[in-house]
Amino acid sequence: KKFEYLKGGKLSYKELENLPVMCLEGSTSTRKYVEDYLAERGTFVRPEFELATSDMLIQFAVRNLGVASVVSDFAEKYIENGELFILKFDKAIPEREFCIVSNERAPMSAAAEKLYDFLLVP
């Protein structure tokens, strides 16, 4: 495993500038959130790959093509079986908060209900 040497230690965000970072495409709110957080701390990364989905980021990471930022739930099975691991930083990125707005007079689609249920799970 190419990045095994990073396992178990704590990194500074600045160290990301020297790693092959993989990100979601630039138009996503998640990408903007992470970039803004890093920029506030003086860290600017140039992604090796910009991919459309978290699933793609996970698959590239499994193949040791770089390090990626994804919601841990999406990578849970890969983390549990040891194919991936979570990088530890000297300061954690704060969790994001979401607000859900719905119309009580209009039923939610099946996809909206699934997202709603997912976001409500603690």
Spans of model-derived segments:
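Short, well-ordered alpha-helical scaffold segment located
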Residues: 2-4, 74
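A late-sequence structural motif
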Residues: 87-122
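Residues that scaffold the ATP/ADP-binding catalytic core of kinase and kinase-like folds
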Residues: 6-8, 77-78, 87, 122
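Active-site-adjacent beta-strand anchor residues
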Residues: 23-24, 50, 68, 101
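Secondary-structure junction motif
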Residues: 5-7, 13, 20-41, 108-112, ...
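Short Pro/Gly-enriched coil loops immediately N-terminal to beta-strands
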Residues: 1, 9, 13-17, 89-97
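Short beta->alpha junction loops/turns
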Residues: 26-27, 50-54, 91, 105
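Hydrophobic hinge/microswitch elements
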Residues: 30-86
